[in-house]
């Protein structure tokens, strides 16, 4: 720690935190602008530098016991310059996961170790332009701007609700007049007038109620469409790391939670809230009739609320358990359907069925517990309602007998009380839905609150030439995961064909993911034509990079649509030319529908080799300046591979080509071969040059394949 003042760890921390939030940062520029005296970034200059990157930063003082309530990662600032990044807090285990800026590695600290390092100063960081900022966080407050946006429609709904409540107030008064005046004085003419008036009120009440439901459903449907569109756009904008760290079933289950929110918005819950808001009008009239009976109704309302509050935490836990089990089932189902060929080939259907039965039984049991608890909650509400009814009947009868209240007034009072209690009971009975929606919002927030790939402020540069430079690259997938690439320095010239080989797990594919800007390195820069990819628009880059993987996915469309996926308006001639280069034209021509043949889900209607050749054509059709083959020919038969290799000269012409291969014969004609081992470049040269070194790793791998 004594050497901390010699190195500017604040600058390094800013670089890491900016990259975490997908914000471009140039360390040299930051140092030039804010480290004017060359002593490193002080606290004030660090905050200014962060704000210049459009980061939302706030310095706070927090005791250790409050750290599990803050948004992480955050920078722990120390006076001696030995800052570190706090990434995770486990209060149960009293452990803290930090990123040690000095060691450039994650560390797990015990409580005593952390207390020795923590000085109480911490800097909270969020991206202003991304959904990680507090103002953009998806929770119940997200609906407030949506309501404001459609405020005109909601005001119309409120106006209609006012008239509905007035009509609901008139009806009990008519009944009171009939009971106390018409029946006593046998006033048939008055009865006829009241009947006609009541009929008019009923007709208008039905019309207004239907109109309110229509207006409300229309507005909530628009909010639903807006949320659904936002969700899908955000999902596609998430970085690759989000999907690689989660099961497909989990993501699908979270997206499906939108259905719960939709049902809640279009249900009776919100209209019940509106009805409840106008209850003060009824209370005023009820108080006029009988303060004693009104107090009984008033005192019952806290009972409804208390019972619901008592039930809700237990219900929420059980709903959470139900969701988790449903997500497990969803993941297992997706996995089983995806791996159906393996399951059938290995005859493990009974094992999979047993696992499914156990998981399904757990889900059904969790759902049964939710139903039982919800039933208990509803019966408790019914008990309160019946008890209040009995008390009102007894007390109301006493008031009528004593002459303090007429029979008509008692009937009118009970009708008015029903107008108040009915929405309360409805709200209490749908409390389960509200708890479910709360969980749905939280689960959906896992998607919508995850930072997307940053496009704001990125550079859309001119057409690239193909020069690629890796400069001092250090990379790991997660802060607590092993280093995948370590001190990579590599220059690839425009038009050069590079082969990358090595054992599995040596970092070959990771290197190409950095070229596509799927990830930003922990340290160092990836440059194309001298431009730092951290500052470049990902879409601009990926449109000019063609990639063919070992396992490519085709969409359930025609062959021509799959090949021209990135540019649907492309001419048929260009599609056919790309297919010929990929060796796919001949087999496509033999199909009954030719290029209009639907390939099926994930290309299920084609063989593995055919799918691979279409994927190669898809990568070539846009004439990319950089072409990456990641084990692209390993799934091809020898005849198809021969066609590809025969056309390789045409494929590589005018492009920078990177070929990753375990089959060394694929790269022996490359301009240069890069050999990787444990995340480092250990050898490079031409095929014959590498074989001339008998002790080299390349020679060893080549000898194994020759044998």
UniProtKB/Swiss-Prot annotation:
InterPro entries: AAA+_ATPase, ABC1_TM_dom, ABC1_TM_sf, ABC_transporter-like_ATP-bd, ABC_transporter-like_CS, ATPase_T1SS_HlyB, P-loop_NTPase, Peptidase_C39. Residues 154-436 form the ABC transmembrane type-1 domain. The active site is at residue 83. Belongs to the ABC transporter superfamily. Protein-1 exporter (TC 3.A.1.109) family. GO terms for molecular function: ABC-type transporter activity; ATP binding; ATP hydrolysis activity; ATPase-coupled lipid transmembrane transporter activity; peptidase activity. ATP binds at residues 502-509. This is Alpha-hemolysin translocation ATP-binding protein HlyB. The chain crosses the membrane at residues 158-178, 191-211, 269-289, 295-315, 388-408. In HlyB the peptidase C39 domain, the ATP-binding domain (NBD) and the transmembrane domain (TMD) are fused. GO terms for biological process: protein secretion by the type I secretion system; proteolysis. It is found in: Cell inner membrane. Part of the ABC transporter complex HlyBD involved in hemolysin export. Transmembrane domains (TMD) form a pore in the inner membrane and the ATP-binding domain (NBD) is responsible for energy generation. Residues 468-703 form the ABC transporter domain.
